[in-house]
């Protein structure tokens, strides 16, 4: 059942996937559902809802990624980083979170599903000092745009971008973007079977 739904959703957003990638996405949902019972990784309890609210909600960003090296800040159980890594084997993703149980889950997912282009790091974002900066800094349900930019300002490379995944955009939040940052693009995203607003903001440092 989930397999057919995934096929339909991927077709709806025009995102081609191999049989192996589809299997990895479905297996990720299965592991998230299983571990969630013990570790409370997400408030979404139903695998069908996970497919929409977590997998597809992450994958709609995929066509907009520019570069090869990304960090997913406040990734939780690996969202959007793990679905994006599955669909973009040519890119690398660092998954950053301050909670050990989430990092343990991510590492188990990478091991069991054979995902080789992610690395999980347990750290607060302010304390994390990467040896190499990133082409893209991703944030989904992590913080306000103001806080994301304030806490993550040290992470992008010289021509790197911030990718802020937001629901409804408020004028108030947009007005609180700190000085020195510019929104270069605001993209309305359409998630299959999700009747809620979704936006991607691309932001650069001036």
Curated annotation (Swiss-Prot):
GO terms for cellular component: cytosol. Its EC number is 2.1.1.170. It is found in: Cytoplasm. CDD domains: AdoMet_MTases. It holds the Pfam family GidB. GO terms for molecular function: rRNA (guanine-N7-)-methyltransferase activity. InterPro entries: rRNA_ssu_MeTfrase_G (IPR003682), SAM-dependent_MTases_sf (IPR029063). It catalyses: guanosine(527) in 16S rRNA + S-adenosyl-L-methionine = N(7)-methylguanosine(527) in 16S rRNA + S-adenosyl-L-homocysteine. S-adenosyl-L-methionine binds at residues 74, 79, 125-126, 140. Keywords: Cytoplasm, Methyltransferase, rRNA processing, S-adenosyl-L-methionine, Transferase. Specifically methylates the N7 position of guanine in position 527 of 16S rRNA. PANTHER family: S-ADENOSYL-L-METHIONINE-DEPENDENT METHYLTRANSFERASES SUPERFAMILY PROTEIN. Belongs to the methyltransferase superfamily. RNA methyltransferase RsmG family. NCBIfam families: rsmG_gidB. This is Ribosomal RNA small subunit methyltransferase G.
């Amino acid at each position: 059942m989930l397999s057919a739904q995934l096929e339909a959703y991927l077709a709806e957003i025009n995102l081609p996937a191999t049989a192996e990638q589809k299997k990895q996405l479905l297996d990720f949902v299965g592991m998230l559902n299983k571990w969630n019972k013990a570790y409370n990784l997400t408030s979404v309890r139903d695998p069908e809802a996970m497919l929409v609210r977590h997998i597809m909600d992450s994958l709609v960003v995929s066509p907009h990624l520019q570069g090869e090296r990304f960090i997913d800040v406040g990734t939780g159980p690996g969202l959007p980083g793990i679905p994006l890594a599955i669909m973009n084997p040519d890119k690398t993703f660092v998954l950053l979170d301050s909670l050990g149980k989430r990092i343990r889950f991510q590492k188990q997912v990478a091991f069991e599903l054979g995902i080789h282009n992610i690395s999980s790091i347990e750290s607060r974002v302010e304390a994390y000092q990467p040896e190499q900066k990133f082409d893209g800094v991703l944030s989904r349900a992590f913080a306000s745009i103001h806080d994301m930019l304030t806490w993550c300002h040290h992470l992008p490379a010289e021509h790197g971008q911030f990718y802020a995944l937001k629901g409804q955009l408020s004028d108030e939040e947009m007005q609180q973007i700190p000085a020195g940052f510019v929104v270069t693009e605001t993209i309305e995203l359409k998630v299959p079977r999700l009747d809620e607003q979704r936006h991607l903001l691309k932001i650069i440092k001036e």
